[in-house]
């Protein structure tokens, strides 16, 4: 929850935690944590805020990129806000399939209010158990499409997505992509936001399809977004974030290669 420049987050790290974060005018983050285990809570918060990794190599490598260069100059401090659990990233992926981002956020929030434990004004992030006990029809009543509801319940019961932290990104992404009802975009969401991996891009994202359509001068297909992200290699996930934010703030112009 963001209010008056302060980001409030609830999550688990040796018990329920509450963190309040604001950025000072000269850049550093000021953090206040309420937790039974402050050190664990701070370490987990660093992951969620994506300040546990230095993305300077990405900024340097693509400073002159025809699509990303201007975005990097204006948004160089941008980092994706990660989820505290992989299960939360999976929920985002399921809710966000083939719908606009705002509608997906509203649906996600509704499901969290329905199923996740409260911690103060906020909800703790979902775990594997959060939706495993629901019947798909209950999630359908809350607004989730039947196919998506079946996918979320099935995976919550049958797959411990938190264990994906222990495997390489390619293995984790392929494991998600193999699941019925998911695909490349869902794999990118889980890898980028749940695992904190930058190698897997958001191929098939509706915003990137729209961007590709503008660049190509025709209706783009999901395969075009994969081609768009391919040059960014191990940074394809972070490039996805910069391209999507950049497209919202200022349209990107076609280049000679697109």
Language model: regions and residue ranges:
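HhH-family (HhH-GPD) DNA N-glycosylase catalytic core used in base-excision repair
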Residues: 1-258
